[in-house]
């Protein structure tokens, strides 16, 4: 099982120098990938812009959006930006996408909240069409370095999210519940994948939030409550955050036993010491 790490691009206020330093240090420390999360109405960096910067200071690490709320953006823009990052990185991008749960974000861009799932369905088909052109550029920008486009991973636990994995995706990202939440949903995803007649197996990833060192529990709770606001799952995220090295190791072991392909450790603080401590679990 691989272990990647999130970049502190959402830890408020984000610092560009720190984010880029994290990306370079993550690869040097042995993490398999770096990842970013996404919000619109928040003091956070744009996910694909961050990954373009990360691509410039890394050579091997995978680059993940985990996840990007693509229904908030025109599909042609997503296709062009993702293809650009894939080209700049030499084919290291994996595009994790989901619909999100924040009504104000959708109101800000004029997309009806109730239609966000249907918008994503249309986008998934549109991305593949945009990336299928044989020439160097499509109507939506450059052709990706990866033939057919970057792997698309779906976030979410609804029946619709699982359906999208089987119909359009290369895999699934678990965003809630740690290993205890990952294991049963992973089995559901695998079953739906095979029912759809897909070959092989879906890629299965999971996010584990962490904070380490003095006041780790306080720091992580403050960040998660501030970032996610009144979302109904926030307190469960707070309780599930790993705040000691032994808890991080336990989560990694449990995910490994459940058949996870890669765990993404997401920091709740931006100090580089967080990455250095997390690297002790590799």
Where in this protein do the model-derived segments appear?
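Active-site-adjacent structural elements that line small-molecule/cofactor binding pockets in enzymes
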Residues: 1-282
């Amino acid at each position: 099982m691989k272990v990647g790490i999130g970049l502190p691009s959402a830890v408020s206020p984000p610092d560009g120098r720190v984010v880029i330093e994290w990306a370079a240090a993550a690869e040097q420390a042995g993490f398999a990938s770096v990842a970013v999360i996404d919000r619109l109405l928040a003091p956070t960096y744009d996910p694909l812009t961050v990954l373009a910067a990360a691509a410039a200071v890394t050579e091997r690490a995978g680059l993940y959006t985990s996840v990007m709320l693509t229904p908030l953006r025109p599909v042609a823009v997503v296709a062009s930006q993702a293809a650009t990052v894939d080209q700049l990185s030499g084919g290291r991008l994996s595009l994790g996408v989901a619909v999100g749960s924040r009504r104000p974000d959708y109101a800000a861009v004029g997309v009806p909240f109730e239609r966000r799932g249907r918008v994503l369905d249309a986008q998934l088909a549109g991305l593949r069409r945009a990336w299928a052109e044989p020439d160097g550029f499509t109507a939506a920008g450059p052709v990706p370095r990866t033939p057919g486009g970057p792997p698309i991973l779906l976030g979410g636990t609804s029946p619709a999210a699982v359906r999208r994995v089987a119909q359009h995706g290369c895999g699934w990202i678990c965003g809630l519940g740690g290993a205890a939440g990952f294991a049963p949903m992973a089995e559901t995803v695998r079953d739906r994948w095979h029912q759809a007649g897909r070959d092989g197996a879906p890629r299965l990833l999971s996010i584990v939030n962490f904070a380490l060192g003095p006041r780790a529990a306080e720091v992580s709770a403050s960040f998660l409550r501030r970032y996610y606001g009144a979302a109904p799952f926030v307190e469960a995220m707070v309780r599930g955050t790993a705040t000691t090295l032994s808890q991080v190791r336990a989560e990694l072991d449990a995910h490994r036993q459940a058949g996870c392909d890669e765990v993404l450790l997401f920091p709740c603080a931006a100090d580089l010491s967080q990455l250095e401590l997390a690297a002790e679990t590799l």
